[in-house]
Regions:
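Bacterial N-terminal signal peptides that target proteins for export
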Residues: 1-8
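N-terminal signal peptide c-region/cleavage motif recognized by signal peptidases
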Residues: 15-20
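Long, polar low-complexity repeats
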Residues: 23-89, 130-275
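Contiguous hydrophobic, core-forming segments of folded domains
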Residues: 90-91, 95-146, 159
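A short, hydrophobic C-terminal helix/tail in secreted or cell-surface proteins
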Residues: 279-297
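Short, charged juxtamembrane terminal tails flanking transmembrane helices
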Residues: 299-302
């Protein structure tokens, strides 16, 4: 069993700008910081990062990626515990713990259905901590943006001229209605959702306007548990939440852990936050302390 402990933001970051390039939700379809324990056979169509153990039955990864890839399309900091046959359909699988798999098919061109794409590496715990810091920072940044769009009558609408539309809604209101989206002149929409324990009983469907999955981000910045229920359109940022669903994600997902059985399709979040100059180290550390921006590092019991 593993656990997370607090980690300081490295001093090297203090002299840099924040988010000068696309973030992890562009690079990965699925990121979890603890175990991946799907309740059914999970298919992830893009890249995957798992900060804990890989559990579940007969998971499949990299379904929609180029089979000529040889980079690590799946990274698991902990143990490989999945039952049945694990399939890596493009690229390789890197892991940091023990390999307890009963069967593996590496279906990329370089591996020919063998198990040769698996390799053990070090440093994935540190990468998990870095990814958490980055995505927690993005979530806090997005949550602090002023709302520029309107919410009501089952519609998210934007009438401004900026490239980014920002909406605010409570989880209770979100999961009490069907919704449509009208971004107007904006290319991207961020929907900040408040609430700690959130669940869609099946009453909520995302209808017209949600078809461009790469341009929508749901920021569940307070969530500890989240069940989105039906097919969810757009990327989901819920770094401290245990997430579940009984349908598919049409976008990237970043969560504490994932216990659902829907597929995660390869529609990465397409927006890059603006370049932001960080304040002096002492000011920054006080700010991060106040916001609760703490890194997480996975430690393994002896």
């Amino acid at each position: 069993m593993g656990f997370y402990k607090n980690a300081l933001i490295s001093a090297g970051l203090l002299s840099c700008s924040l988010w000068a390039s696309a973030g992890p939700l562009t690079d990965y379809s699925l990121i979890v910081f603890e175990d991946l324990s799907p309740s059914g056979s999970l298919h992830v169509h893009g890249r995957t990062f798992i900060g804990g153990d890989l559990n579940g039955s007969s998971p499949e990864f990299a379904n929609a990626l180029d089979k000529s890839l040889t980079l690590d399309t799946v990274e698991v900091a902990g143990d490989l515990n999945a039952s049945g046959w694990l399939k890596v359909n493009a690229g390789a699988l890197a892991y940091g713990g023990a390999n307890n798999l009963s069967g593996v098919n590496c279906n990329g061109n370089a591996y020919g259905g063998s198990a040769s794409c698996l390799h053990q590496v070090s440093g994935l715990d540190d990468k998990a901590a870095s990814l958490y810091d980055t995505l927690k920072g993005e979530s806090i940044y997005y949550a602090g943006l002023a709302a520029t769009g309107n919410v009501g009558g089952g519609l998210f609408s934007y009438a401004g001229v900026d490239d980014l539309a920002v909406f605010e809604i409570s989880g209770a209101d979100l999961f009490n209605s069907n919704w449509a989206l009208d971004l107007g002149a904006a290319s991207y929409g961020i929907i900040n959702v408040s609430g700690v324990n959130l669940s869609n009983s099946g009453a909520t469907n995302l209808n017209s306007g949600f078809g461009n999955y790469t341009n929508i981000l749901w920021n569940f910045y307070e969530a500890d548990t989240l069940n989105v229920g039906n097919q969810w359109k757009g990327s989901v940022l819920a770094v401290d939440a245990v997430v579940s669903t009984w349908n598919d994600f049409e976008g990237s997902l970043a969560a504490k852990s994932y216990v659902g059985y829907g597929q995660v399709h390869n529609f990465p979040w397409g927006y890059t936050p603006p370049e932001i100059e960080l304040p002096e180290p002492s000011v920054l550390l006080l700010l991060l302390s106040g916001l609760g921006l703490l890194g997480w590092r996975r430690a393994r019991s002896a």
